[in-house]
């Protein structure tokens, strides 16, 4: 039997680590938490210092027995749970179950699953950090208080099955507030005018925008004002009033935190935050990379720090110099500042070895794992490269009291942009403007027609922008962003409309009720301040009991007041036009964990339910039935026939009513990352099978 037992959280991690350590070590997984507050009762003794009443989690008895047996046989037990508050608390519970002294050197911590990092951690075991455990327990107890005392209020006043949470309700409020802003937004009309100028008939033309009149910002509010401005500019003499030419540097972005990784994965890869964290977990816990065996490819993925270790920056600088050239290596290490309250003991998310390029590991990764790893690898390498340098030219031009501005930028040195692919650089359009001395007269080549615009409302939140908002407001921590969004989606408080997150009537009803009676608790400043207090507990700067008392006393008074004053309201019910075939009632729309479905309002007498068939207005090419949008268990959209199972037609791509001009086969629709829709033929025998149709080509494709 091995002399040493190492306990981690997941079996994937245990398999990877056991290969590093050899015969003298056995590695076992706790499978997450082993003890927790009971689900059936409140489980917190408020009258006795908020003592939690932990129990072993149901279904984990056999695992606990196995871990106890392994611990008794081992000379030394090392607790190697994740390097954050949740991991520290799991470690503390493990110590209790196994009879270990938390004050003994039983805890090891590493931020990457590589042989070097794990073996180095074993050389420096430490005590369990009881302050971090207190911080986690405080958060858990407050969330239990809110969940177990506020949720029943919603059951009594609205309907059973609803829930409220300290962070999730604030997240829903943020989305509801944005929806109100959008609904109340009044567009304002404005116009812009651009002049196309040149020095002489042989010189290149360039565009200049009208920005001022008589030294004040020009505001053109209607067509009449635009026409008047155009008339003046057509007759004006143009002259360069001021010319400026300088270099402008564009610095690389810092390495990824949890938040910035989730945001970029949504925008660039169209991954949900949940999917991003699942893939990141797989890359962190270990992937078999051939002869090298299983190894963690990235560092710990729950972090709000942008710090890189000295070893990592040295490796990056060496790699950049040998791969791209010395001219791409900055004189000193690029250092980035972490945000306030960041846990800077952690590193940013980075590859565990820059030498494991995306190309080198591609054959060992799934398609989505590779996409995410490439994103992380490129961002990390770029953050230690030199800035890109542009030559920027700015001209201020006078014309009959009007001032126009022409600006251009040309890339002089690509720097970190060397890592950008063609699609990324497509947004980096260069615009050349000639440098002309002051008082140079110019010719009006063409006055472009005035353009009408309207101010736009603030955009709907997406998963990416909501994560950014939560982080900027100090709400939650890296580990909570993704679960929070998933919870409010599952509860039906918000829905996804494409990429947009939109509040539902139910979400608005709950937010309005709770913010009316709990406005001092269900708000952004309070939630953010509580996160700061949890940080202070972890740093031994605040007391757990004091924080809990300061929260519970006002909360309990508000709860009593709300219970007396809130009138019972009916949750909004949307009636469908579908009749229940079992009892004849008109079925209603219900929100479940996996989206909307139809249910009979006669429940529990009638328990009939059925999925909502979302027709796309296209007939099945095989049988003539209706094509409907469906979803897999993992929420991926596909298209099938309403006559299933008689008709087995399915497609990942969206069928259309248009047909290939060459073979007459149905055309399918794809949407690229930029939201552009393209049509293509899938007939393998057609010479245009791989051709895409867009714009006029799509319009010319045959229809039935």
Annotate the PLM regions.
Residues 2-4, 16, 25, 151, ...:
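Basic, low-complexity terminal or inter-domain segments flanking catalytic cores
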Residues 113-195, 246:
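C-terminal or mid-to-C-terminal helical accessory/interaction module adjacent to the motor/catalytic core
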Residues 217-254:
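Metal- or metallocofactor-binding catalytic centers and their adjacent structured scaffolds
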